UniProtKB/Swiss-Prot annotation:
SUPFAM superfamilies: ITPase-like. Coiled coil: none annotated. This is dTTP/UTP pyrophosphatase. NCBIfam families: maf, PRK01441.1.
Length: 209
């Protein structure tokens, strides 16, 4: 199967777009999917990440069908969940939420799960769950206050962005770094490649970092 011409990302997340661009992939269209992200009763963080990724992909595909644009398109969605044990941390929107998350994460390990869901042009459903373990140092009161003042936590799962200032909190990371940012690149590119969409075909010659 030759590489399709369209890659649809079921997200408006700038960091997910940037990660795809890092791998040489430019989404042809962003179709953010508004869904209820509330965990079900006793839902495991793994299950939540998988369920939300699939819901986003299905919602985006439904919209594309209405627009008559689903043909020859890969529809990619992802959802990232941060958890301490089975306790799911919110995507923080207010400072108190972020402070509570960071106090909980301070000096201990947590897990970051990203569910990836991909609908192929032939209608196949592909999915993957990626897990990364992260350990934070003990965050001082002054550091916590400064981080909250930065506003970097807003809208972030677990109340932090590892690619930003919070990277200085990380003592140890086991697994995919890009998973913690919001889209595990190796697994995403592998899912696409399995159905003929090869990222390297878009790599420009003579690129310098």
């Amino acid at each position: 199967m030759s590489a399709p011409t369209k890659l649809i990302l079921a997200s408006a997340s700038p960091r997910r777009v940037q990660l795809l661009q890092q791998a040489g992939l430019e989404p042809n269209r962003l179709v953010p999917a508004e869904i209820d992200e509330t965990p079900l009763k006793a839902e495991h963080p793994r299950s939540l990440a998988k369920r939300l990724a699939r819901s986003k992909a299905e919602k985006a595909l439904e919209r594309l069908r209405k627009d008559g644009e689903e043909r020859d398109s890969f529809v990619l969605a992802a959802d990232t969940v941060v958890a301490v044990g089975r306790r799911i941390l919110p995507k923080t929107e207010i400072a108190d939420e972020a402070s509570n998350c960071l106090r909980l994460l301070s000096g201990r390990s947590h897990r970051v799960y990203t569910g990836i869901c991909l609908f192929t042009p032939t209608g196949k459903l592909r999915h993957k769950l990626v897990e990364t373990r992260v350990r934070f140092k003990r965050i001082s009161r002054e550091e916590l206050e400064a981080y909250i003042a930065s506003g970097e936590w807003r809208g972030k799962a677990g109340g932090y962005a590892i690619q930003g200032l919070a990277g200085s909190f990380v003592v140890k990371l086991v697994g995919s770094y890009t998973n913690v940012v919001g889209l595990p690149l190796h697994e995403t590119v592998s899912l696409l490649a399995a159905d003929g969409f090869k990222a390297y075909l878009n790599w420009p010659a003579g690129t310098q970092v």
